[in-house]
Amino acid sequence: MVSEVRSVIKRVAFGNTLLPQEFTLGLPEPQTEITVWLSGFGEPRDVTRRHSMVCAAPLTICIGFDEGQAPPEKDLAHLSLKFCERSGRKQVLAEIGLKPQTMVAEARSEFILFEPRSSKNFCLPRTRLCTHYLLHAYRQWRSDNTQGIKMTFLERRAGMVIFIVPHPIMLVSVGTREDGNVFPMNILGDLGNGYLGFALRGERLAAGLVERAGRIALSSLPLAQGTLAYQLAHNHTKKSIDWSQLPFATKMSAAFNIPVPEFALRVREVEIQSVRAIGSHQFFIARIIRDDNFCDGLQFCSIHGFYQSWRLAKLQEEDEELKTSLAGDAFNKRGRYRPQPVKEGPAEVVLLNKNLNR
């Protein structure tokens, strides 16, 4: 009886919006659902493929500009990012006000790092959004699951907005077969002019491995292999791995001869240009040396649950679609609490029903 009452209360308070904050699904690469506009000086600029998250605490965003094309210093404090539906009504789904911190220069490019000064989210009605924020604060009070990252309320809200843009969950390969590692990453973004930005937790071994190697290979995961991202997450804390024990076959990348998964949809080989310790993370700016597309298919991605709720609300059969998409997310995360399986024979590829990820 008590559980039934709780279910009714949840249904009234949250409707169909009580989803995991990190929601996984498959989408074409590159994503075509969201456009990010930089506003506050002249005509808005499309920076969808020119920005990257830098750090969680303090939450920091990097935006890339062509050399000499950055906004004037007098306008920097008035800039904002608007996250908009790319098609349809082109609805504004969220906005982050920006506060400039520092500038980094590389050949032909300038990168400005910002922290949030404000954050607005329009994916859910205001009342329902406030209910979610209260629930989030209560859960944080009861059980701190932030893994040592302390974020302000503004930073948490801005982080939710950033992940309205679908983020690919990629596998990072570093080193050689004799002394190397492979682990997942989803804090990354293109910065323009062949540059890429990505971030790794500063206290974990993976960040040091990448900095010392100076070059890595980034592999796009097909949706059917998404669970591997969770199975390999513990490799962030390892100096090296035994590649022969991975549950999948590998091949060598074309430019740097780094082991990468045979099933990769796309492999980008990048060379580190600069590294900066910023709060909880190490931020890397890298130059793309080679970009190989091997096959088409849905790429394994993550979005925020608020945005998934907005996506589902547009569908006629919302309740059924909710169940289906939740089943797909749970299927993708089934490796989260499992140790990495030891390879005892040919890897079995489990094909995911395309209807399970919406």
Which sequence ranges carry the predicted segments?
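Basic, polyanion-binding surface patches
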Residues: V2-R358
